[in-house]
Design a protein with these regions (language model features):
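DUTPase catalytic domain/fold
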Residues: 1-145
């Protein structure tokens, strides 16, 4: 297992945890003083009350919780969001309300999940032509239905 150092901004904050042995993500919870209401079609920045330090060559991806998306039409706006290895600020989640109803976030609500992922850095080399492929420039549905 890869060690993730976590700083809690309040002693009562519940640390993210894997819910099952097969889980790839850990749930993140809202850490807020007052309820936040997200109007239909609008966004809100939700603090989690934690900051992390992860090893070099890793990132934490912030993704929606499938239950919130399926049942309430609530998602993470910039999914997947990235927490870089050198970022030390509080993790905040940009939620978007895609439903037609108000959505209320309370402190302790599970609002997103975080997944630790290895990253590979690329080295760019400018060229005049790219190698040919069968697909070529085909995109946006060009490989079939």
């Amino acid at each position: 297992m890869v060690r993730i150092l976590v700083k809690k901004f309040d002693k009562n904050i519940k640390l993210p945890a894997y819910k099952t042995s097969g889980s790839s993500g850990m749930d993140l919870v809202a850490y807020i003083k007052k309820k936040i209401t997200i109007n239909p079609g609008k966004t809100a920045m939700i603090p989690t009350g934690i900051a992390v330090a992860i090893p070099k060559n890793y990132e934490i991806q912030i993704r929606p919780r499938s239950g919130l998306a399926a049942k309430k039409s609530i998602s993470v706006l910039n999914t997947p969001g990235t927490v870089d290895a050198d970022y030390r600020g509080e993790i905040k989640i940009i939620l978007i309300n895609l439903s037609k109803k108000l959505f209320v976030v309370k402190s302790g609500d599970r609002i997103a999940q975080m997944i630790l992922c290895p990253i590979a850095k690329g080295k760019l080399k400018e060229v005049k032509k790219l190698p040919r492929t069968i697909r070529g420039k085909g995109g946006f549905g060009s490989t079939g239905k």
